[in-house]
Structures are given as C-alpha cells and as structure tokens.
C-alpha cells in the first residue's frame, strides 16, 4: 500500500486516484495542489471528493500500467484432474507443464510431459476433453512423480542381481575397472545400441524383398540374468527376428561371474582394460573379436566339429551387433526368414545356474532355446579342447570358502503345512475298511466313528422302543428311527416352505422334489427307453415294464395281464375290472367250496376257524 507525506497508509481509492491522475481521464492535480490557472480551494476540495467516482468511471491504471480494479477480487478456482478437489489457481499445475528440473533442451516446447509420464506409468491415456479439468493440484502432482521415480527404480532393479552392481571408479589415482566389472555395470542398463538397431533395419529391408507382410513387435523375451531384454519382431507369415538389445553385456557378465580365462592376445588385453570405462561399446566389440579369434583356433584344431555347432555352443549374438558378429551367423535359407535366437552356451549356462541358484528361473524362453537346452550333448559336443583354460581346483575351492555363509532359516516347531492333504491322499489311495466284529453281522464302514455308532445302536443298546403316541403300536430298535417317525407322523411341524407357491413340507427331500415341478427338471432317466422322472420310486416302477412277463408273479384272472406286486394287481382290478370285483364281494356266504377231507382238529382243510360270538 502507498503512503502519504506523513507516512500514513492511504485507502485503495485514494491511492488509485493519486496514482492515475496523470492518465487520460480527467484533469485533476496530484496531492491537491492549486492549479496554475488560479483555481479556488473549493474546486480542489470538490476534486478530492470526486476522486473515487472518477476512478471508477474512468478506469485509470496504476503506476505499473496494470488494472488494479480487480485486486480485491477472489482468485479463480478450479478442480484437480486426479483427486477432483477444488483449489485456487495458485495450487493447480497444468497437465501440459514440464517435470521440475527438466530443461527445454531435453524436451520440445509443445511436449506434454505429465500426460506422457502418466500414460507410460499406468497405461491409461489422458483424454484432452475441454469438459474435463486441465490441471492437477500440487499435492497430487508431487505424489505422482514420487511414485514415478520409485517405480522406475524398481523396474531397473527387479531383474538385476545384487552381486552384479558395482560402484563406478571415477576418482583420480584409483585403478580403473576391468572389462568384466564394466560389463556387470553395463548389464544393468536396458537399452539398445545403434548397431543393434542398424541390424533390425537391415532385416526389415531384406524381409520386404521376399514378403509383403509388414513386421511388428511381437513379444519381448527376458534373459535369465541381469534384466537383459530381447525383442522379437515378426510378421503374419511366420518370419521373425530376435533383436538382442544387450548381448555383449550378457557376455561380459558371464565372464565376470564365472572367472573364465579367455585367450586374449598380449596387446589386446591392456587396451581393453584401458578403454573399458571410456567406451563400453568399443570394449564389447573388441571382446567379440577376441572370441572370434578363439573360435577360429578351435576350428583349426578340431576339423571334425561343425562350425555351426561351435557357434551354437558359443555366445551367438544377433545380426544387429556389427561386423564382429557377422562371422558367427549361418546363412539363412531364404531372405526374410531370420529367426535366430541368442542362446548362451549350455556349459556356461549350467555353470551360471550353479553360481546363481538363488535367482528365479521362471523367465520365458523361446521354443528354440528350450529345444536346445533339452537336447543332450553328444560326445563331440562335450569334448573340451583346452582343459588348461579351466580354473584350477584350488582357486575354485578358495572361492567357495570365501563365499559368505547363508543364514540358516530356523524351522518353526510343529507339523509342516500340508500334512492334512498328505493324510487325505493316503486315505484315498488305501481306504481303511472296518468290519463289524459281531458274528453274523455283515456291516462294513470306512470310518471308525461309523463302526462305533453301528455297534452301539445294533449290538449294545438293543431294546424295543415303542412309539409313545396313543393308538400307534409301532416299535423301533433304534432311537433315531423313533424320533424321525414321531416328527413325520405325529407332528405337524413343516419347516420347509416353497418360495414360489408357499407349499410346506416336513422333509427337505420332499421340498427338492416339489421344486423340480416348478423348474421342470427330471434328473432320472431310464437306460432302456429314455423315460425321465423326478423320483427313484417312479423310475423303479417304470423298470418293471421292461421285465419279461414270465418274471411277474401276479396275474389278472380276467385279462391275463401280470404284475410284479399284489398291490399293483389290486389297483388294476379296481380300475379296469370294477364290476367283476363287486360281483365277487356280493356272492352269498352260503356258497362254499365242496367239503374236503377233515383235518385232525375236526375242520375241513382250507377253512378258517371263526370265533363264536359271545
């Protein structure tokens, strides 16, 4: 705020009037000084009274040329795109701003960094819809980039062995790192070299000559160690090309892990050690040349071994690594069919697995890699022409002694998890059968509890249990049978209710059969004719129709039809021959069969003795 001559603060209206009196609106003088034209003091007082109205009507600007009329207004408000909270414009960051710390030299002016990073991290595209907020609050912005940096660190370390991390030696007077140590550091980087990309472009051009399909990235193959990634490019016709983004790094890492003495020249070794820090790519190419000379010497000493076989044993790398790898490539059968995969030698792979047995072996491998690993080695393949190049036994023993002892894991007391499943499997394989020990009883049970219950009910507590309901003369030998009888016959408790029609039942199985009528389900079916029904009693009665008539014991006197049970015959007589059955009942009692021979008791045979009325 502005001050007057005495140091007092002026009100906003007076400050704006005094600051803008020299503008193009009005002819007032500053500080109320009299005009040179001899204006009266009354005019000056009137001018002082009209300063506020003149400022509002004219819209004078301040000393800095900006409109100060809106200084007292509230700031613009907006919503956060992520948390949907309402914030002032000072607390919002545009989604098109750059990341803090990145300069314009690294990014183009129109690049939307927050949108790019959000999509890369979460895989969700940020839509540029005008109806959506175009800003995020500072809190969400800071939290997002904290998670962004943390996840990037995790992605770089998730497939890297802790033993492979080396601190770079950049101080003066310190011995420079060797090629193996530099390779271990380079192996942590997941990036492709220019030569690798050059090889990919060359394959695309050769592929376009013989095939019209456009190749694209099919999948990525992660190697077993160091987080090295292989990119597989291919087309719809089956042509593929495996681009090993860091095969030289893999070779260097294997050398450092296994301490293998390679046959390097006297002049080549010091140059590699000197240039390993300054140019890792050049060191890797020279290492490839050294391996090429070694393979050449091996082919000279072993003429019977195929060159391609030696290449498959060595660290065969992709065609995109420059001239040092070209001699290792076998000529393809047709252009565009470059399906080579980069596989380390089986012997070195086995040794690496021994060294790094604690690493996960669940990485995805290509079909060619799995076939090569599963194929057993022949006598020629397992022959090693340079046994003196191996590390001596003393050194290996010393290395094993220096290896830190792994902390012993204390086992928790008690049974190990999964012991119940083992017992269950043993029971299923060899079921235990319990037979009733009482003579004449053929009861058999799979569990001991069932056998104990059987012995208690049928052999130990054997007694008659009559029904307590008056008028019911039924007797039961087992207590639970009596309880079921009382519940079903002598009580009207119906706890099972149908949800659709409201009908009640005493037993659950009756409710299930009733619900089948609503659903129309008929789970039982006749194996002979395909008849379907809901209850087993219906199916059992239906199966009697398929029996031969000779097997049926009860025959009808009128029509000759035979039945399995007497009850079925009585039903047939009452339904089909009701008149005949009525006539039989109406026969006079006097019509008796002819008298037969008397029995010793004084009655005729077949005649029942009737009690005399009292």
Swiss-Prot record:
It comes from the Eukaryota. Zn(2+) binds at residues 80, 83, 137, 140. Residues 409-422 have a biased composition (Basic residues). GO terms for molecular function: sequence-specific double-stranded DNA binding; zinc ion binding. GO terms for cellular component: kinetochore; nucleus. Found in all the examined tissues, with highest levels in kidney, liver, lung, and spleen. Residues 1-46, 271-422, 588-614 are annotated as: Disordered. Pfam families: zf-AD, zf-C2H2. Residues 386-408 have a biased composition (Basic and acidic residues). PANTHER family: C2H2-TYPE DOMAIN-CONTAINING PROTEIN, KRAB AND ZINC FINGER DOMAIN-CONTAINING. This is Zinc finger protein 276.
């Amino acid at each position: 705020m502005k001050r007057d001559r005495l140091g007092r603060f002026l009100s906003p209206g007076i400050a704006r009037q005094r600051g803008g009196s020299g503008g193009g609106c009005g002819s007032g003088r500053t500080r109320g000084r009299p005009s040179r034209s001899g204006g009266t003091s009354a005019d000056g007082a009137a001018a002082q009274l009209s300063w506020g109205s003149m400022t509002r009507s004219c819209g004078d600007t301040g000393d800095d040329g900006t409109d100060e009329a809106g200084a007292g207004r509230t700031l613009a408000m907006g919503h956060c795109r992520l948390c949907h909270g309402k914030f002032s414009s000072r607390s919002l960051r545009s989604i098109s701003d750059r990341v803090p710390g990145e300069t314009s030299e690294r990014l183009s002016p129109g690049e939307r960094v927050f949108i790019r990073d959000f999509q890369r991290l979460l895989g969700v595209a940020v839509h540029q819809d005008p109806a959506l907020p175009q800003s995020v609050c500072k809190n969400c912005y800071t939290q997002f980039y904290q998670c962004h940096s943390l996840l990037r660190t995790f992605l770089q370390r998730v497939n890297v062995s802790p033993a492979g991390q080396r601190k770079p030696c950049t101080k003066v007077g310190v011995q420079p790192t060797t090629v193996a140590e530099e390779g271990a550091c380079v192996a942590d980087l997941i990036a492709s070299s220019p030569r690798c990309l050059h090889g990919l472009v060359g394959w695309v051009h050769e592929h376009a000559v013989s095939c019209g399909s456009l190749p694209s990235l099919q999948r990525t193959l992660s190697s077993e160690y160091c987080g090295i990634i292989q990119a597989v490019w291919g087309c719809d016709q089956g042509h593929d090309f495996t681009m090993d983004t860091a095969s030289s790094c893999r070779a260097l890492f294997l050398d450092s892990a296994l301490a293998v003495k390679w046959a390097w020249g006297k002049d080549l070794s010091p140059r590699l050690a000197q240039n390993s820090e300054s140019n890792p790519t050049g060191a890797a190419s020279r290492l490839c040349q050294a391996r090429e000379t070694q393979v050449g010497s091996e082919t000279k000493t072993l003429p019977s071994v195929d060159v391609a076989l030696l290449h498959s044993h060595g660290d065969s790398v992709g065609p995109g690594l420059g001239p040092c790898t070209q001699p290792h490539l076998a000529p393809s059968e047709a252009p565009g069919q470059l399906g080579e995969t980069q596989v380390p030698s089986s012997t070195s792979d086995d040794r690496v697995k021994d060294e790094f047995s604690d690493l996960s072996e669940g990485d995805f491998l290509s079909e060619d890699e799995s076939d090569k690993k599963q194929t057993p080695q022949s006598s020629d393949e397992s022959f090693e022409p340079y046994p003196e190049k191996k590390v001596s036994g003393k050194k290996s023993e010393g290395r094993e002694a220096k290896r830190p002892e792994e902390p012993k894991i204390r086992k928790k007391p008690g049974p190990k998890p999964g012991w119940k499943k083992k017992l269950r499997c043993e029971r299923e394989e060899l079921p235990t059968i319990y037979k009733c020990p009482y003579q004449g009883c053929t009861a058999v049970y799979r569990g001991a509890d069932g056998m104990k219950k059987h012995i208690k009910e049928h052999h130990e507590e054997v007694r008659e249990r009559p029904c307590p309901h008056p008028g019911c003369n039924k007797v039961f030998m087992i207590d639970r049978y009596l309880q079921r009888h009382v519940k079903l016959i002598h009580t009207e408790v119906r706890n099972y209710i149908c949800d659709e029609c409201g009908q009640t039942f005493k037993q659950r199985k009756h409710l299930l059969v009733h619900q089948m009528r609503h659903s129309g389900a008929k789970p039982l079916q006749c194996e002979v004719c395909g008849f379907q029904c809901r209850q087993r009693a219906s199916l059992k009665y239906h199966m009697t129709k398929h029996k031969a008539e000779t097997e049926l014991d009860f025959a009808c006197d009128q029509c000759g039809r035979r039945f399995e049970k007497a009850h079925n015959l009585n039903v047939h007589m009452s339904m089909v021959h009701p008149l005949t059955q009525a006539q039989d009942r109406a026969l006079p009692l006097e019509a008796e069969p002819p008298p037969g021979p008397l029995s010793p008791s004084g009655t005729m045979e077949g005649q029942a003795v009737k009690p005399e009325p009292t």
